[in-house]
Each structure stands twice: as structure tokens, then as C-alpha cells.
Curated annotation (Swiss-Prot):
Record localization: Secreted
Signal peptide (UniProt feature, chain positions): 1-17
Protein name as catalogued: U1-hexatoxin-Iw1b
Record keywords, A-Z: Disulfide bond, Pyrrolidone carboxylic acid, Secreted, Signal
């Protein structure tokens, strides 16, 4: 019985991400599209990321969120880095 309860808790935790198809994600998050839409935290330093310009018309991002403020998504490595987002 304890095993069944543990399995149920794991399943509930893995599916508890807020659906964002019709809802707005909170501060510090974005709506990332996998097989379903889920609110996810903004990407941090060295995390994989999407560029802000890559948002769909509905404001969703494919797979990864853009970087948190102060960072930009390097389109060569698709990771969040410090510095200017302009190409040099």
C-alpha cells in the first residue's frame, strides 16, 4: 500500500505544472510547449534557452524559456550568457 501511495505522489508531482494554454504564467516563468503547454521558470546562466523573438503569436516558446533579465540567449550555443545580445 505504501508503494502505491508513493507512486501516486510521484505522478501527481510530475503533472502539477500549471497548464498555460488559456492561463497566464506567473512572474519569472514562461509558457513552454512540449507535448503540452507548461509554465516553466525562465532560463538561468548556462541553461538551454529560446530567444525572446522566437515566441509564437500566443506567447509560447518551444521547449525552453527565454533567459532571465540581465542574460541573453546565445544563438550559437542556445544557452544563457551575460553580455550584449548583439552580434559583433
Amino acid at each position: 500500500l505504501k508503494f502505491v501511495v508513493l507512486i501516486c505522489l510521484v505522478i501527481m508531482a510530475s503533472t502539477s505544472a500549471q497548464q498555460c494554454g488559456d492561463e497566464t504564467c506567473g512572474a519569472g516563468t514562461c509558457c513552454a510547449v512540449f507535448s503540452q503547454n507548461h509554465c516553466r521558470r525562465l532560463s538561468q546562466m548556462y541553461d538551454l534557452c529560446s530567444d525572446h523573438a522566437d515566441a509564437s503569436p500566443s506567447g509560447n516558446y518551444l521547449f525552453f524559456c527565454p533567459c532571465e533579465p540581465g542574460l541573453h540567449c546565445d544563438r550559437n550555443t542556445w544557452t544563457c550568457t551575460e553580455g550584449s545580445s548583439r552580434s559583433e
